[in-house]
Amino acid sequence: MAKGKFERTKPHVNVGTIGHVDHGKTTLTAAITTILSKKFGGEAKAYDQIDAAPEEKARGITINTAHVEYETANRHYAHVDCPGHADYVKNMITGAAQMDGAILVCSAADGPMPQTREHILLARQVGVPYIIVFLNKCDMVDDEELLELVEMEVRELLSKYDFPGDDVPIIKGSALKALEGDQSDIGEPAIFRLAEALDSYIPTPERAIDRPFLLPIEDVFSISGRGTVVTGRVERGIVKVGEEVEIVGIKATVKTTCTGVEMFRKLLDQGQAGDNVGVLLRGTKREDVERGQVLCKPGSIKPHTHFTGEVYVLSKEEGGRHTPFFNNYRPQFYFRTTDVTGSIELPEGTEMVMPGDNVSITVKLMAPIAMEEGLRFAIREGGRTVGAGVVAKIIE
């Protein structure tokens, strides 16, 4: 039985910790929940509770992720923390944990390390829009100049990957000291400064219902005397009866009008984000529409065939390939509801990609797909998933 109703009085934001192994991501996560729960309510989570992250399946891929939540003065946060580097790679690429912003944890004693760089690059590739830095373990650095040097390095690294390095908030502290209840500047107060930075620096995300209408088409029916009906789940926005809509992808884009919306055999005057609906289209022939296209607000999304993506290749244990793949590998790319064949170009100097690797690729599809940066896809061979990816940049 639920312990009382979930009160959604504050806006909801999704965040997560990223950064190099042993720089203190999990300790910081524990410190945030512990310290904020004292002031704003919520549940304190100990390091061990977070570290024993349960396994989840996202698109057939096993990922270990810990989910915690906490309140600040203005918001409710859902926060993800992963135990291992591979879990971060999988999590960010599959979008299992969509982040509105990330907290980059960097040890002041070590400065930026290989995974610091890799997680910043991943954040850029998968479209994490904002990064806030927590410079951890400041109790281990006595030299003020050394701290400034590390801060400068982190800012340069962020700028290198197109984040606004000069403007990113950097909070100096010690997660461990904060957990121990230390009241000095780098203890508990640092956690409150981090909370303030989260509230002020990450804008409240736009809700799905407020975005332009989009429905991935799952099925097409012909209803005699009424016309053609497409079905699917509204991904975002609202569609109203009488509105113009576009059918995008696979073939040339066509405009049509929504003349009816049906849900559970009832007629509605509109369908909105989250609804499973049938949409009746005026004057559209059954053979003009197919699964894999999208129905959308006119002009809101364009069809593309050529893009770069960041991909995680499933390991053998995850049911992926047993062998590497090479340049010009031609699998199927599963976007939303359908497979499209495409060819993969590997980055210069990369001979092959092994199962369990992640890699940046350039893809050319045989047919155009309604696409925008941040769209997730699966890579399949004969119906089984061998990889997961995200569109990083559209070329054409």
Swiss-Prot record:
CDD domains: EF_Tu (cd01884), EFTU_II (cd03697), EFTU_III (cd03707). The keyword Zinc does not apply. GTP binds at residues 19-26, 81-85, 136-139. Its main location: cytoplasm. Residues 136-139 are annotated as: G4. Keywords: Cytoplasm, Elongation factor, GTP-binding, Hydrolase, Magnesium, Metal-binding, Nucleotide-binding, Protein biosynthesis. Its EC number is 3.6.5.3. The keyword Glycoprotein does not apply. It is an enzyme of class 3 (hydrolase). It comes from the Bacteria. GO terms for molecular function: GTP binding; GTPase activity; guanosine tetraphosphate binding; translation elongation factor activity. InterPro entries: EF-Tu_GTP-bd, EF-Tu_GTPase, EFTu-like_2, EFTU_2, G_TR_CS, P-loop_NTPase, Small_GTP-bd, T_Tr_GTP-bd_dom. It catalyses: GTP + H2O = GDP + phosphate + H(+). One of its GO terms (cellular component) is cytosol. HAMAP family: EF_Tu_B. This is Elongation factor Tu. It comes from Aromatoleum aromaticum (strain DSM 19018 / LMG 30748 / EbN1). The lineage of its organism: Bacteria, Pseudomonadati, Pseudomonadota, Betaproteobacteria, Rhodocyclales.
